[in-house]
């Protein structure tokens, strides 16, 4: 009987111990990333679930395009020139095995220009299994550096392993199922305290900060990556710098960063598309003004790019004049010399800027248009004439047709022949690269319908995002790629025939057919609005507008560097750059 009683007691103790350990481990594993960080954290980036993000990436449109057999066949030659390494593939396999969740890296402070970082992730499996992979990474990172001083410290039941040199420290520790890394041993101890719920100050956590809570409430629950930035540290440094030089801004004035309470961004996959969201917590800058997209009436079925945004140039004439002077031009100084003030500009023009790019199928290059509403035709004409006088050669010619004033100028010979033209009516100013497109656009501005607005492609794309209040952009990737292929494919074939460097890099005969590419493409749309207490900027497409802009900049820099290395000329192009949405100053 005693043996049975003893056995029951032992089982009860074991069950209680197992339950307690399970509860403790669940409490640790359920700790949010924000709950692990100090309240004054400046920046944190997070990937909630690496394997889920990778799986969704492999099902998105742009990855499916990359996996097309024809695309792989075309890329085989250029990729063959790149040194092969298995390190990246092995690292991805290791990460997949760890199955990291809530992976994060955070900038917690900048003291004496010494940034401090912490990071970590929730791993799958046992600590010993994780250490086999992480230990390998640690060895590669540390290498055979003889100046490294390694030490192990016991702290609250955890082993902190630190590697130190005279200039930096890297501390790592396990708190299963978490692995943590920090650039300061004291920060590592604080991180472990928060993970184990031992922190004496429960309010000193990022998730207790009101600005952070407001920002992350705008973040979708199904994102694959996100970040949060607290600009206060930078605005305080700017204020200190102003005080040091004796500069005091007037009440209500200040830089954009001083007006921002917080910034957060996220990315998710949505029906094969990439969807970015950016939130800027700050006061509204535009008063009683909203985007009308009135320039949409100029669009045609051949329009592949459309932009509308609020841009109050009248408020920024002094800044623009300083920038122009720095660039070596006196375009805005001419307005001042002519007695034209910022008030005159605001009276002459509306604040909604529009831009369109059309590419007819029978044209080798696109035509670009820029539009501004006219509210006072007389003042607008005075401003235009004053600006044109800034041209030193004075080669602009003026004509009038059907009540519209046209100003045009023949540019010097270049890779793409252009004739800058400005049309001014009592309702709108249109600037373009050739007289024909400007005149046709002026005719369309008098109508009430738009081929672009009526197209199903545009309608479907525009409805993917909430209605904008101060920024909207649309880019038809199918039409753009089709036109680029028709114009550049013959040039690429010719270049490969006469330029050995091109022939050695790619095989243009294996360039995929346009339909192989375009079946994976769809329009890119970007929309920005003021929502409650900040600006919400969203973009969706096979890639987003910001990603397109960053990619184009990287590609251009690499292309220019390669051309300089090989002694090739890099012709200028007339393609529009991807704009970045920002609040209207």
Which ranges hold each PLM region?
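Structural boundary/hinge residues at secondary-structure and domain interfaces
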Residues: 2-162, 207-264, 269-364, 381-394, ...
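Charged, amphipathic alpha-helical scaffolding segments
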Residues: 6, 13-15, 171-191, 263-289, ...
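Short, surface-exposed beta-strand/loop micro-motifs that present aromatic residues
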Residues: 33, 104-109, 162, 168-176, ...
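A conserved glycine-rich beta-strand in the N-terminal activation segment of trypsin-fold
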Residues: 164, 168-240, 415-499, 585
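Long, C-terminal catalytic modules of enzymes
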Residues: 231-236, 245, 413-415, 435-436, ...
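Loop/turn-rich, solvent-exposed surfaces of beta-rich toroidal or solenoidal domains
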Residues: 364-375
């Amino acid at each position: 009987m005693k043996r049975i009683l003893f056995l029951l007691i032992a089982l009860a103790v074991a069950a209680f111990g197992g339950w307690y350990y399970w509860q403790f481990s669940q409490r640790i594993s359920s700790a949010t990333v924000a709950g692990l960080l100090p309240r004054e954290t400046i920046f944190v980036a997070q990937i909630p679930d690496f394997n889920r993000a990778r799986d969704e990436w492999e099902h998105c449109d742009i990855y499916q395009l990359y996996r097309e057999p024809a695309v792989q066949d075309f890329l085989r030659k250029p990729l063959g020139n790149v040194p092969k390494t298995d390190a990246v593939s092995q690292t991805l396999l290791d990460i997949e095995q760890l199955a990291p969740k809530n992976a994060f890296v955070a900038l917690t402070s900048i003291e004496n220009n010494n940034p401090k970082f912490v990071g970590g992730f929730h791993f799958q499996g046992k600590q010993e299994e994780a250490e086999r992979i992480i230990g390998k990474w640690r060895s590669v990172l540390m290498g055979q550096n003889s100046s490294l001083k390694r030490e192990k410290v016991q702290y609250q039941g955890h082993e902190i392993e630190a590697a130190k040199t005279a200039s930096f420290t890297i501390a790592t520790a396990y708190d299963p199922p978490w692995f943590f890394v920090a650039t300061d041993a004291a920060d590592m101890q604080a991180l472990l305290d928060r993970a184990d719920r031992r922190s004496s100050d429960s309010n000193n956590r990022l998730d207790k900060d009101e600005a952070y809570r407001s920002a992350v409430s705008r973040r979708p629950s199904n994102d694959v990556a996100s970040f949060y930035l607290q600009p206060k540290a930078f605005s305080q440094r700017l204020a200190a710098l102003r005080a040091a030089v004796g500069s005091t801004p007037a009440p209500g004035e200040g830089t954009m960063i001083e007006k921002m309470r917080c910034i957060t961004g996220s990315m998710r996959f949505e029906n094969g598309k990439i969807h970015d969201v950016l939130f800027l917590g700050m006061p509204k800058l535009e008063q009683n003004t909203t985007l009308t997209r009135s320039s949409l009436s100029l669009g045609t079925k051949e329009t592949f790019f459309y932009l509308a945004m609020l841009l109050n140039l009248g408020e920024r004439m002094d800044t623009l004049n300083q920038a122009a002077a720095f660039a070596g031009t006196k375009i805005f100084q001419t307005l001042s010399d002519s007695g034209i003030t910022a008030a005159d500009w605001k009276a002459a023009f509306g604040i909604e800027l529009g831009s369109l790019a059309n590419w007819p199928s029978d044209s080798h290059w696109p035509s670009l248009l820029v539009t501004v509403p006219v509210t006072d035709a007389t003042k607008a004409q005075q401003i235009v004439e004053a600006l044109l006088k800034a041209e030193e050669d004075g080669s602009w010619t003026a004509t009038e047709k059907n009540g519209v004033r046209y100003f045009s100028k023949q540019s010097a010979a270049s890779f793409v022949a252009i004739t800058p033209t400005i049309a001014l009516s009592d309702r709108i100013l249109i600037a373009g690269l050739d007289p024909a497109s400007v005149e046709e656009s002026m005719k369309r501005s008098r109508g009430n319908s738009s081929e672009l607005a009526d197209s199903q492609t545009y309608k479907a794309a525009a409805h993917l995002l909430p209605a904008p209040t101060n920024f909207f952009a649309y880019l038809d990737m199918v039409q753009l790629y089709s036109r680029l292929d028709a114009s550049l494919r013959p040039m690429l074939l010719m270049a490969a025939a006469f330029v050995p460097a091109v022939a050695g890099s790619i095989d243009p005969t294996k360039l995929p057919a346009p339909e192989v590419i375009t079946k994976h493409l769809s329009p890119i749309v970007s929309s920005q609005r003021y929502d409650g207490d900040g600006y919400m900027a969203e973009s969706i497409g096979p890639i987003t507008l910001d990603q397109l802009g960053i990619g184009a900049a990287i590609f251009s820099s690499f292309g220019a560097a390669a051309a300089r290395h090989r002694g090739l000329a890099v012709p200028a192009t007339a393609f529009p750059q991807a704009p970045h949405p920002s609040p209207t100053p």
